[in-house]
């Protein structure tokens, strides 16, 4: 099939671009390299479509075929979007992304290279031809400029015209299109086919395909889901489409596999989506009110939400009683502490959904307990993890909130409803970073969870980098008991810098005791320690910040590197993020920066920047197919080399 025919079919609706969650992810370098390959006649790969039923004539790409089916373009979405945007001179209707990536591509008649518009060297220079204008106006639109540039040299003029003609003929190029058809081609089968064919490119998830099929029959599904995601984002919680779809699937089918949605009609899906959105908002309110988990950084265990949404489905969208709520939250906290859903997500979710349907929350807890060898207990060593990306950072925040830990200066309990909804609450290093670095402690030791506590911004500024032996003594004298509310050992000897490891061990023991007491109270029944449950999600909530946070203080050059990546349209990383074993779900390390879906966003292998890995952590990361870098310089060289190779295409 010719490229022009594919684009015409997109306009006509015979081929639709599916409603995948990622939108357009290519960078300008990729667009330029793609057209360089087309111009040189290099192979660009085939295309893959999936023939699926369409119950409505309205789809993302136009109207459906007359036989009630539609061809969803699975492999080639980025390429077709690029071809459409450049040849038509505008992004397609379904476009979501940075439109500048598709506009301004120019061709140099002399060097035969493609570059994006740069006024300094292209404005008024006839050697540079606007590629979109060429496709729109044809060769005739460029003849005057070519004649002037050739300056009466007939041979040179012929060369220029031949080069322009080679560009316009790109749309006439024939490419191979494979079509997946047949009632036996389930979502699981189609995903497997796609990922085998497209092993080196952007991966297609089962959620991608399920959403594509849903949007073929209900085009408003994706905008409706995005509206819910935007509302939660305004409240401080960033979720993804795939996550929301997983919740809907659990509510409607009681299963984890997206293939189960194939049997759900549009009317039921619409009803289930509304119910799920309401349930998630209800859960966020309850988690903020009962556990104090009121912003995205501390909301761990997101993969457990489908199970909790399913429970609410059984009870009309509300907890039937406080006992059920507390026991569910007991299960939820333990599930994220032990990585219940970070490995084989669908397997664990199916087990939990089945347990919930068969025996309620008690069966859920029993399944989790058995998976942990019969014990659900927090040990002091569990708090050894470092940084805000550790699984136990949310637990520290939870304990601070539910027990009403006191601020060191004001004495105010750090509960909800204070300080503009905690917008000025900050993470405080009990032993200041600067002093620990002076004494030779590593980044991981400095940023250990057991060295964190939460204070108001004003208190943090007052303490600054004071010697802990001095300022802790002042606090205990002025406000007896305040340190104990933050689980800070009162043995003065432990406040000395040289005794920092012993301080850590003592505080970990105190935190473990507090955690076990509270989690047991959740299991046994409603606790007298209650927080007011908000009636609606707050908007524009400011997450807790780290006082004096400076990326370069811990990782030299990180701030500059992140700025460069943003300018290059590369994916933004997760900062201070836990990296897990993809097979077992066990935590490996906490990375300074982590690109779970590659630097280009769902293209390539996961990338990890982790300066202080142990040999065991390094081996585990390599076994999990992570690309690991220990410095920003090494990562920058890797990125520069990759871009140079792409530019040479």
Annotated model-derived regions:
Residues 532-649:
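Nucleic-acid endo/exonuclease domains
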Residues 427-429, 456, 593:
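Hydrophobic, well-ordered secondary-structure elements that form the walls
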Residues 446-477:
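Short Cys/His-centered divalent metal-binding micro-motifs
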Residues 336-427, 435:
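Intrinsically disordered, low-complexity N-proximal targeting/linker segments that flank membranes
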Residues 1-254, 295, 320, 326-334, ...:
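Basic- and aromatic-enriched surface patches that contact anionic nucleotides/nucleic acids
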Residues 76, 417-451:
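Histidine-centered nuclease catalytic patch
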Residues 246-315:
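Structured, charged N-terminal subsegments at the starts of enzyme catalytic cores
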Residues 484-540:
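C-terminal, well-folded lobe of enzymatic/effector domains
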